[in-house]
């Protein structure tokens, strides 16, 4: 089709250029400051196998986008550099000439395999769009770009014969819309298209009870049942464009803000179970998306608890039968322990370390492979979700603390355990109780307490209280319980890291009696910690007390009670509660745990959204299921 220059095209291109530097900061997948040398051997850049390696092809595309951003930056030495402009222009033609015309169906171009579709359906259209716009006053790439988008993005949800949804469609739709602008359509005409409407309905981000999108507790899901924030983070840079094209209310930015607040930090750190299938716990762009304020944040239905304060960031994920505890793909299958068992805090003043996807991290239980490598491959040609065979989780939060209690069985990891985590002002206490291997083991198990990067820090020589980037690990024994083993240090020379671990006997693991616990504390206040953990005799009750007893967490699973003396708050939850709107808390279930705290049911002061009958309390809340009282 002949390219028609209509006003909406010019208006969008101006907006794109005016905001490119800001939106590029928000882009997660990128080459931030492109410096790679152009080549004259037909591969675009030196030392690149552009036409035979999917990895190299992706790097080339991101480098071209990065160079386009530098070309647009008035403060960059390459601003409107003519040699660079010609290199970008030539690169677009080289790519186009190497591609099959029309696009292949259910296969990838250049002899690459289907899992490499992402480069051709998402990154390549973005690259052509970006280069076409930044060079518009130097070289005319409009017809070339329109033609490529015609073949590789015939619809915002269809590329190379494959339909895409959710996060992928959010990315694909923007260059598709640009292609329509090149063809002379207006913003309004494009917005009326059926498949564009599908994407716009997605990015309205209405709260949903299940499936893709932002749930009522503000957790983001993709692939139906996966807490896959990588898709939301990767798509965020497109939201301002959609609001410009189709109106400022197109994307519900408040719901997006609440969703990101649930999981992120200003340092860019995220629990690895929430971000990416490569096991990463870091996204450099997070600080460019929103300001992450301090507080205790909980996603009660999606089982996410996050704490940010002036000392640390902490985040833990729990499990539920309808939520994937792990998702694998053909290229990523070693991160199940990271997703399922990471229990730690990160110092606000510590260095951000390059992350290793090996399963060695605070909270991970090592059973069959003590080196942390457990391969749980996908069961099909694409991604596969894995669910717990049993899972009950309850969250409880006050102004100063947050707790999570869970019972879970993970068949692929050969584990069943109870997990109790408490965040407080100084750090985190964690206990695994009733740990059981589903299949017999002969070697002792280990729980990773702390990991030390030996690239930048001296190696540990003892295993008492251990410090690694500004975090102190503290050993605890449980009152009325057999003493627990001291920490043991291991060094992994090939990985250049050390671990502090607690050993659990194989005999205990095989019969379901495994126990391990520890605290991770901000280094500067570790000496202030006075956390205790007590088993109440002749019962299943556990009491965790900390901060000079001002924070007390009592667990009589499935019930968890969190008491905050400073704020006079008391929060109660039941892990067996599966309701999503009207929640019931049986009085019989909480009488004993309240008595441990020298309280009774009559001590509880009810807020407006909680009512009481003879046998139960009732809470009306679409966004959470915690019963929050004063006393």
Curated annotation (Swiss-Prot):
Superkingdom of the source species: Viruses
InterPro entries: Baculo_ODV-E66_core, Chondroitin_lyas, Lyase_8_alpha_N, ODV-E66_C_baculovirus
Gene Ontology cellular-component annotations: membrane; viral envelope; virion membrane
Compartments it resides in: Virion membrane
Gene3D superfamilies the record matches: Baculovirus E66 occlusion-derived virus envelope protein, domain 2, Chondroitin AC/alginate lyase
Keyword list, A-Z: Membrane, Viral envelope protein, Virion
Listed SUPFAM superfamilies: Chondroitin AC/alginate lyase
Entry-linked Pfam families: Baculo_E66, Lyase_8_N
Function: Component of the polyhedra envelope.
Family membership noted in the UniProt record: Belongs to the baculoviridae E66 family.
Protein name as annotated: Occlusion-derived virus envelope protein E66
Species of the source: Leucania separata nucleopolyhedrovirus (LsNPV)
Lineage, broadest ranks: Viruses, Viruses incertae sedis, Naldaviricetes, Lefavirales, Baculoviridae
């Amino acid at each position: 089709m002949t390219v028609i220059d209509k006003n909406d095209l010019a208006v969008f291109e101006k907006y794109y250029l005016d905001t490119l530097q800001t939106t590029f900061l928000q882009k997660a997948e990128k080459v931030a400051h492109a410096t790679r040398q152009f080549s004259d051997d037909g591969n675009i850049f030196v030392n690149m196998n552009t036409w035979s390696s999917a990895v190299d092809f992706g790097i080339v595309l991101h480098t071209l986008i990065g160079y386009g951003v530098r070309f647009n930056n008035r403060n960059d030495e390459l601003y409107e550099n003519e040699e660079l402009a010609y290199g970008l222009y030539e690169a677009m033609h080289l790519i186009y000439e190497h591609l099959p015309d029309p696009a292949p169906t259910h296969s990838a171009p250049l002899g690459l395999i289907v899992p490499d579709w992402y480069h051709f359906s998402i990154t390549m259209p973005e690259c052509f769009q970006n280069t076409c716009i930044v060079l518009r006053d130097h070289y005319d790439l409009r017809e070339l770009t329109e033609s490529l988008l015609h073949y590789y993005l015939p619809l915002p949800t269809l590329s190379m014969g494959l339909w895409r949804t959710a996060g992928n469609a959010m990315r694909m739709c923007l260059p598709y819309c640009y292609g329509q602008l090149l063809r002379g359509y207006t913003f309004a005409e494009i917005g009326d298209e059926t498949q564009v409407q599908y994407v716009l309905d997605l990015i309205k981000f209405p709260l949903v009870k299940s499936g893709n999108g932002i749930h009522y507790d503000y957790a983001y899901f993709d692939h139906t049942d996966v807490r896959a924030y990588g898709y939301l983070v990767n798509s965020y840079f497109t939201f301002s464009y959609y609001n410009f094209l189709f109106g400022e209310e197109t994307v519900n930015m408040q719901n997006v803000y609440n969703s990101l607040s649930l999981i992120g930090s200003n340092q860019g750190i995220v629990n690895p179970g929430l971000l990416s299938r490569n096991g990463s716990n870091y996204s450099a762009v997070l600080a460019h998306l929103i300001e992450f304020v301090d507080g205790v944040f909980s996603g009660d239905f999606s089982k996410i608890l996050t704490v940010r304060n002036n000392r640390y960031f902490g985040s833990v994920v729990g499990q539920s039968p309808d939520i994937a505890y792990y998702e694998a793909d053909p290229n990523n299958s070693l991160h199940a322990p990271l997703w399922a068992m990471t229990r730690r805090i990160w110092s606000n003043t510590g260095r951000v370390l390059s992350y290793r996807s090996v399963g060695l991290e605070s909270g991970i239980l090592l059973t069959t492979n003590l080196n942390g490598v457990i391969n749980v491959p996908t069961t099909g040609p694409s991604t596969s979700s894995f669910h717990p065979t049993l899972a009950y989780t309850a969250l409880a939060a006050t102004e100063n603390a947050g707790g999570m209690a869970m019972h879970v069985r993970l068949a692929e990891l050969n584990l069943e355990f109870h997990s109790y985590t408490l965040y407080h002002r100084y750090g985190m206490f964690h206990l695994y109780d009733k740990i059981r291997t589903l299949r017999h083991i002969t070697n002792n198990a280990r729980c990773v307490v702390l990991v030390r990067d030996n690239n930048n820090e001296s190696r540990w020589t003892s295993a008492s209280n251990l410090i690694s980037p500004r975090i102190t690990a503290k050993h605890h024994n449980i009152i009325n319980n057999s003493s627990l083993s001291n920490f043991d240090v291991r060094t992994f020379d090939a990985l250049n890291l050390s671990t502090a671990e607690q050993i659990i006997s194989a005999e205990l693991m095989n019969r379901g009696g495994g126990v391990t616990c520890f605290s991770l504390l901000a280094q500067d206040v570790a000496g202030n910690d006075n956390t205790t953990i007590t088993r109440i005799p002749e019962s299943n009750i556990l009491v965790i007390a900390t901060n000079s007893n001002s924070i007390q967490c009592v667990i009589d699973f499935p019930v968890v009670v969190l008491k905050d003396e400073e704020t006079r708050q008391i929060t109660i939850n039941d892990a067996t509660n599966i309701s999503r709107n009207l929640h019931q808390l049986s009085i019989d279930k909480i009488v004993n745990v309240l008595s441990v705290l020298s309280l009774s049911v009559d001590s509880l002061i009810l807020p407006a959204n909680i009512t009481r009958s003879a046998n139960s309390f009732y809470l009306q809340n679409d966004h959470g299921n915690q019963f929050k009282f004063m006393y």
